[in-house]
């Protein structure tokens, strides 16, 4: 059962809440030498649009099944990736 629990725990990493690097609902926020101006999370997202699947990098996925010693078979699938930008809203 621990395998199933760990698979369930990694099955939803791409589900994230709305987020934005914003200050005052639309003003820019400096982030060191690589400063990026980010707006608030509006209808178009913090970086001017909503995140697209192409915004994510290092996406990996896998699916399969396994059988326990008692003969029960379980199926699993997962996918994950990293958002490479500094602004955006889901």
Curated annotation (Swiss-Prot):
A Pfam family reported for this protein in Swiss-Prot or TrEMBL? Coiled
The record, for InterPro entries, names:
HssA/B-like_chaperone, HssA/B-related
Q: Name one GO biological process term.
A: sorocarp development
The protein's superkingdom reads: Eukaryota
Stated family: Belongs to the hssA/B family.
The protein's name = HssA/B-like protein 4
Q: Which organism is it from?
A: Dictyostelium discoideum
């Amino acid at each position: 059962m621990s395998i199933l629990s760990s698979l369930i725990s990694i099955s939803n990493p791409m589900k994230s809440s709305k987020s934005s690097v914003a200050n005052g609902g639309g003003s820019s926020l400096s982030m060191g030498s690589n400063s990026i101006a980010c707006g608030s999370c509006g209808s178009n997202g913090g970086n001017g649009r909503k995140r697209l699947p192409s915004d994510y990098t290092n996406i990996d996925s896998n699916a399969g099944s396994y059988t326990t010693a008692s003969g029960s078979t379980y199926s699993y699938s997962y996918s994950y990736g990293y958002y490479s930008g500094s602004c955006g809203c889901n």
